[in-house]
Amino acid sequence: MFIFKLIRYAMEMQLIVLLSIYCKLFNIDKTSKQIGLLSRKLGPKLGISKRANQNLLKAIPTLNKRKRLEIIRDMWENLGRTSAEFFNIKTLIKEKSRINIKGREILEENKNNGVIYVSGHIANWEIIPIAIKEVDHLVGAVFRESNNYFFNKWMIQQRKLITEHQFPKGPSGTKEILNFLKDGGSVAMLVDQKLSNGVKANFFGLNAMTASTPASLSLKYGYPVVPLKVKRKNGVNFEIEFFDKIEIDKTGNIDTDILNFTNKINLFLEKIISDKPEEWFWLHNRWDKRFN
């Protein structure tokens, strides 16, 4: 069984390498558009798109079938574009004019002070550390390890082009994050996916197991949590906006405060997802049936 899994992982990695080579043969605008259109055509036909449809029904029940299908097609195009752009990440690092930063003063205010930036898998989320490094050079990012050993090693090396400081999700990663924050570093976290050992928070009116790390680190150690949103603008151009730090009225009960804080983060995510639902990753198994 292990051998078959290893073979499958190796074949998957070969496809990724071939796609990477192809994307690097041409400029980022061309490959982003091509892979985006290919994903738009093929993606909706995959079985996993049923989950995206179900998630849309749960989160935004007012949408009719036609609108849901339109969002799913657009979502796949964005995912294709994001993948192609990741293979050409050096271009996004070099061509700074492609990323317009709003709320730069918030970055300046928190520079070298230890801050947690939170967002979700929206538009091209990989550009977040690139934008932060425009002002604050000590930036780290949290990542979820892939089951595919080969792909995981490749992703870590590829992300080193963006930041040397990478932290795995989980208890060991949290310790590393805390030490990094103590040294004045900034950490970017995507907190929109299900985390089984998180807290049961509200997300689009449903119970969703959510990472409590940002809330916990902020409430226990005083590190600010700054939300941000990324928007795709005209192909391979982006706008990233930073907002005021999240604050709550403390109750004196740490568990209650962590939940309230996490709910506030989720409310922010709801707003930016609702603004451009076609740019969010609807394929994730976000809502556990056991809790809804």
Show which residues each predicted segment covers.
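Short, flexible loop segments at the rims of nucleotide/cofactor-binding pockets, characterized by
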Residues: 93-100, 144, 163-169, 203-205, ...
